[in-house]
Every structure is written in C-alpha cells, then in structure tokens.
Amino acid sequence: MKLSQLSILFILLFIHSFVQANPLKVGSWMGNLNLQNTHELFFQFEVDPNQKITIKNGGEIVEMKDYQIENDSIKVYFTNFPNYLIFKVDPLNENKLSGYFVNPDRKKHSRIEFKAFFYDDTPVIDIRYKHENFDGKWQVTFNPNTEDQYPAIGKFEQVNNKITGTFLTETGDYRFLKGTVINNELWLTSFDGAHVFLFTAHLINDTLRGEFLSGNHWKTDWIGVRNDDFTLKDPDSLTYMVKDDFKFQFKNLNGQNYVYPNQQLKGKVVIVQILGTWCPNCLDETKFYNELYDQFHNDGLEIIGVAYESPENFEDQVERIQRYIDNKSVPYPILVGGRASKTITSKDFDMLNKVSSFPTSIFINKDGEVVKIHTGFNGPGTGEIYEEYKIETIQMINRLLIE
C-alpha cells in the first residue's frame, strides 16, 4: 500500500513539474470547442514569448490574463469576463492541449470541451471548390415561423473562401464573426470570452438556410435572402417613457445610496447607461463612452452606469463592477443595479415601457428632460454603421451642451 501511494505521489509530482517546466509552446495554435456534441467551433490563438495568450476573433484581438498552475492543469482567465480556459498539456506531445472552456455563472451547460493543437499559421486558399459568393447584405430571420422569430441583417465580406461580418438585430449586433465558405456552405464563428457562437448555412435557390448554436445551451434555425433595402426598427424608437419623471435610487460601490436627479447634476447633460459587465456589447459601448467622457466631461457631460450582474449578493456584484472599471479605466461612476434580469431592470426603470436589451442608454438634456433612449448597441463589428452612430452621438452631445 505504501509503495502504491508513493507511486501515485511520484506520478502527480512528475505531471506537475512537467507543466511548470514546460510552458506553452510559443506561436500559433488552433483551438476547438465541441458544441452540443454535434458541431465544432475552431478559433486561432497566439502564445508569445512571455506566455501571454491572445485570441484572434474576427476583427478583434481578445486578451487573456497570465495563466496559473492549478494542480496538473493550466488555468487562464479572460481579461474582460469571469470565464476561463482550463486545460492540460499532453505529457507525450507538447503540441496538444485538452480541457474545458468554463462559464462559472451558468448553472447548467457551464463547460464546453476544449482542445487545441500547434500549427503553422500560413494562410491557405482552398482552390478545390467553386465557392458561392455570400458577400453583401442579407435579410435574416432567426426562429422562423415561430412565436419567437426575430429579424436581423446579415452583413458579410468575402475574399476567396474566407468570410467575415456580423448580424445586426434590434437589440444589438452579434459582434465580430469570421469563417469559411466551401461550395454552397457557410460557417461563421465568434469566441470572445463570453459569446460562443457558430452559424452554419447552405445556399439553396438564393436562400440561406442554417443553424445558430450558442454554446451548449441553445440552438435555432435561421433563413436569409439578399435584400439591400431591408432595415430594422430604429433603435431609438423601441424604448420610451411611460411616466413623466425619470428618477432612480441605487447603491454605489461603497454601499451608499445614490439618487438621481441630484443637485450635482443640475444643468448637466447626462447619459444613463444600463449595462452588465458580462455583456460584450456593453463593453463595446463602454469603450465608446470612455471616449465621449474624455472629450466632453469638462464641457458638462456626465455619464452614470447602472450595472446588473450575475452574482446574487451585493459584495460579489461590487467586485465584478470594480474589476470592470479597473480593467477598462472607466472614468465615470457605475452603480449597483442588482441581479442580471430584464424583468428586474424593467421594474427598477418603470418609467420606461420596458428594458429589452443590455445595454440601453438614456440621454438627458440640461433641463433634466429625456431626449433620446437608445436600445442595444451596434459596435465596431458593424464597420461603417458603428462609425456613423459615433458621429451622430457626438453631434448630439455637442448640440445638447450648447443649448
């Protein structure tokens, strides 16, 4: 028995020392997430000489924190979210990794099987097939022919058999997508540390028909047809006031009550941002609001965030919000709204018809009047649509400040 215990201890020490003595191989890796045991989502990541890991997610680079050794495994947290990868290096092959992507906030389907292999990052153009052209604007319906169907715009750019783009919905975009085309088949993916999205489709008689998978917990059908004239509802029209007064009270990160309106904001232009630190679209909006604040704060612009978080208790909610503020150098205050729930948020902001999206922003003039409510956020993944929105918002803030 003693010999057996010593043998086990020796093996564990050997594996632990192997992980410590053999850092991740520097260079390009191909990751693979097993979705619902039916599909695979591939993504690229890099390991630099300092062992920093960055994921290539379409048009953005997703940073990860320095990894830590946990027993015989390596655990790496995403910078912007509480999610992480935990994996082992194959002791017989340093070019292979295996483990899981974990979302600790999910009570069900919190783990997705993860594998990776080291590879030569040389672009390959597949010339074996005659590829269909998916470039352009598509009118899309998710959950078609059901009570839950909703419209979207597919916006794609294709070069040879490589494709990038996004889907815009009435509550925001699906951010940076990239993928591959083979014959009449389309694959688009996103893995940004929060979203785990896979879109597949076949082009049949000018119609796209496919599936949309989100992690291990959700799957739906979608269809699309080309339509350059198709538009979604105006995001400034979806949320509106149903009571005269816009007011609220929440606790700040120190547990003190914060009441709006207040004397300090009298005569100021104010943006109230309803968000969650778990929300990638909210992060896109926060980055833009950081720019707005830096540009216009001295002229009289104030921004107040109200965050709704996944943890149930106040202390953990504060920790999430404080980490978000620190990581992104957010210059404006963010209050604690409570649990992440559109029902709870709609009850807290009962002067609105509803809160249908994180984020939602309320724009208020110097007289304390709500002049605009913007639902959702179409971020940098939408290209010129995002740039146009930035210009429009800056022009509006300028106008409100001089009125």
Mark where each language-model region is:
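Bacterial Sec-dependent N-terminal signal peptides
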Residues: 1-28
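Central antiparallel beta-sheet cores of small beta-barrel/beta-sandwich binding domains
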Residues: 30-90, 124-125, 132-200
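N-terminal helix-cap/turn-to-beta initiation motif at the start of protein domains
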Residues: 19-30, 117-139, 158, 236-242
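Structural micro-motif
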Residues: 329-333, 352-362
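N-terminal "domain-start" segment that seeds a small globular fold
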Residues: 226-262
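Structural microenvironment flanking redox-active thiols in thiol-disulfide oxidoreductases
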Residues: 284-329, 341-348
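Thiol-/selenol-based redox modules, centered on thioredoxin-like
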Residues: 357-403
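Short active-site neighborhood of thiol/selenol oxidoreductases, capturing the structured segment around
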Residues: 258-283, 289
